[in-house]
Amino acid sequence: VDPEKEFAKAHYEQHMKVTGKLAIDGETYEIDAFGLRDHSWGPRYWQNIYSYRWLTCSFGPALNIMVSEIRPNTESRTEGGVVIRDGVLERIVHLNIDSTFDDDRPFHRSMVADLELESGEHVTVEGRVVGFIPLRNRREGHVTHIGEGMTEYKCLGHTSLGISEYLDQVQ
């Protein structure tokens, strides 16, 4: 990939469990949680891709998901991600995300992701956005819309909160 056309350089994601204590103003809070660390080295170039859909959720020790659909342009896309059950990781080899949006704004409100795993198993993830933050990035005459959704997910009998992040170029 041409470095000038990359979206996020040296990007990685890690599902993890975090334990510890957090002290604020003399109060101590115990932390025992699951989540996902998302990191890129250097700046992101939001205008280098046409769109993406990124869904992530930790349901606890039994289930974690990360779903990614990236469209570098209007003609092509990459798809992937993982489903982790009881510590066993399985790759997503094909996916389809059906999303609903506000009528008058490009804000996503819900989605259904049909996932095909490398084993051939099909898994469905349903999401409903319960909190939304619209963002935008402007560079060299381009406007990019990024929507961050706190999302209630349902998958394989589990329900939990996670993130749905959608990026689209504004024409």
Stretches with model-predicted labels:
Residues 1-171:
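Structured soluble/peripheral alpha/beta segments that form catalytic or ligand/cofactor-binding pockets
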